[in-house]
Design a protein with these regions (language model features):
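Non-catalytic substrate-recognition and accessory regions of acyl/acetyltransferase enzymes
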Residues: 1-97, 101-252
């Protein structure tokens, strides 16, 4: 990530010119990076076409890709993040805990570049049970009131730059966030009694369970209804960019 890395040489990939920059640290050697008791390959490529530094941790296709724009080295973007047991060199990365180890390793690696002050990502993960699928983002919101990356790594929602002042923002919060029970009641009125009971049972449970996805596959529709309810409440397009924050506050 730093163009002053000592092991710099030019090479070509698919005809596109790159430069590699390997970090030289006491706890790393030979293009390896350590995370807990696991070891991962890493590679940094400079892409002259996109003008980004592309950092691969683990397998180039299956694990993590981080990009840093050449003209904005304060921000790192995690473009791909996929768990696979072969991501570490010993090919035995465990499920669940291995996912967290892989991400923490990537964040620690990013922290070696002192200029980077912000890390962004988009959660597109899907939780699958047999033929049923649901976005992990939605499942965690309804279960914990936080997304997966909020709960496990401290990420925060990004909000578009808007003209809303801090005073206006606080006024909106006071109006729409205080009476949570009323909002929950309004939301649950959209569903049949048995679905409401199943939903209430689910949010009381302590762990994510695949049976929920099997028996309550309308959760994606519920999420859409919740958005529609919020849009009806706000009645103003300039507040649309606060919907994710509203969901987080309401379901916490």
């Amino acid at each position: 990530m730093n163009i002053s890395h000592p092991y710099r040489y030019a090479h070509f990939t698919n005809g596109i010119p790159y430069h590699k920059y390997f970090i030289s640290q006491s706890d790393q050697s030979g293009g390896k990076i350590f995370g807990s008791e696991f070891k991962f390959d890493f590679q940094e490529d400079y892409n002259n076409v996109t003008h980004t530094i592309d950092v691969f941790i683990g397998d180039r296709k299956e694990c993590i890709l981080i990009t840093i724009e050449e003209d904005n080295k304060k921000v790192a973007h995690i473009q791909n993040f996929h768990y696979h047991e072969t991501c570490d060199l010993y090919k035995k990365l465990p499920r669940i805990s291995g996912t967290r180890i892989l991400m923490k390793t990537a964040l620690e690696y990013i922290s070696l570049e002192k200029r980077i002050k912000k890390v962004t990502l988009t959660d597109k993960a899907v939780f699958t049970h047999k033929s049923d699928k649901i976005q992990l983002f939605i499942l965690y919101l309804f279960k914990y009131g936080e997304s997966y990356y909020q709960k496990n790594f401290g990420f925060k929602y990004m909000k578009k730059i808007d003209q809303i002042t801090q005073a206006e923002n606080m006024k909106i919060r006071e109006k729409h966030f205080i009476n949570k029970k009323k909002v929950k009641k309004e939301l649950l009125q959209y569903f049949a009694k048995e679905k409401v009971e199943r939903f209430l049972e689910f949010i009381e449970e302590s762990q994510l369970i695949s049976e929920f996805v099997k028996n309550f596959t309308c959760l994606n529709n519920l999420f859409d209804i919740y958005f529609a309810f919020l849009k009806y409440e706000f009645k103003d397009k300039k507040y649309n960019n606060l919907f994710e924050e509203v969901l987080y506050k309401k379901l916490k």
